[in-house]
């Protein structure tokens, strides 16, 4: 199985424009994410996917592989889907471009799902939240899964309700690493956006 790591990076973020190029110890943030991704031995290639000339220039200056993509994409997953039309691969892993200290083992954990069960077409991660402040934080995306571990709902609000039978329910945060088999990614990219 050929596995491709993709780091979507856009300059025009509404909350923090230029975030991928913010300087961290003399290097742009995107460089640190790329270095962490390169530590994943399962990756055959790692690319930054961007629509911005400044990010492309920074990638080239720091010897990172970069692919220019459309500026019409609504999500990082759409950007990864475009990369899948330009690069041969069986599995594409979307790594958030604003996580300079992402643990490579977490990326490997997502990839391992596809080796354990060949019927899996899409995967992501969840981690239990134990800090009450993080449970309440709207900056943390929470996820509810079914008994098999399949995601049912994502929210920045507290889900599930934080009290169940008089005791606190377990709450999980979504870890923003997504992996897609090529066929699933092609179908996913054709789906229209919804309000949720």
Question: For the regions a protein language model found, what residue spans apply to each?
Answer:
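Residue-level signal for inorganic ion chemistry
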Residues: 30, 98, 181
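Short, high-confidence coil segments that cap the C-terminus of an alpha-helix
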Residues: 43, 89, 117-120
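N-terminal glycine-rich phosphate-binding loop and ensuing alpha1 helix
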Residues: 2-49
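Short phosphate-binding loop-to-helix
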Residues: 47, 53-112
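Short aromatic/basic micro-patch
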Residues: 15, 101, 179
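Hydrophobic/aromatic residues located in beta-strands of well-ordered beta-sheets
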Residues: 5, 46-48, 92, 123, ...
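Conserved core of the sugar-phosphate nucleotidyltransferase
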Residues: 104-194
């Amino acid at each position: 199985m050929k596995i491709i790591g993709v780091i979507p990076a856009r300059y025009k973020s509404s909350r923090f424009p230029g975030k991928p190029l913010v300087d961290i110890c003399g290097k742009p943030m995107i460089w640190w994410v790329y270095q962490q991704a390169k530590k994943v031995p399962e990756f055959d290639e790692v690319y930054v996917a961007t629509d911005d000339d400044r990010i492309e220039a920074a990638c080239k200056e720091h010897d990172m592989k970069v692919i220019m993509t459309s500026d019409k994409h609504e999500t990082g997953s759409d950007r990864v889907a475009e990369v899948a039309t330009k690069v041969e691969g069986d599995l594409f892993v979307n790594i958030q471009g604003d996580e300079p200290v992402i643990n490579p083992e977490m990326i490997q954990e997502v990839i391992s799902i596809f080796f354990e069960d060949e019927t899996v077409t899409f995967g992501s991660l969840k981690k239990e939240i134990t800090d009450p402040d993080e449970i309440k934080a709207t900056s943390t995306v929470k996820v509810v899964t079914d008994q098999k571990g399949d995601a049912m709902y994502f929210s920045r609000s507290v889900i599930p309700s934080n009290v169940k039978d008089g005791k606190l329910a377990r709450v999980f945060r979504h870890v923003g690493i997504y992996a897609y088999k090529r066929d699933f990614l092609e179908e996913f990219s054709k789906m229209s956006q919804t309000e949720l």
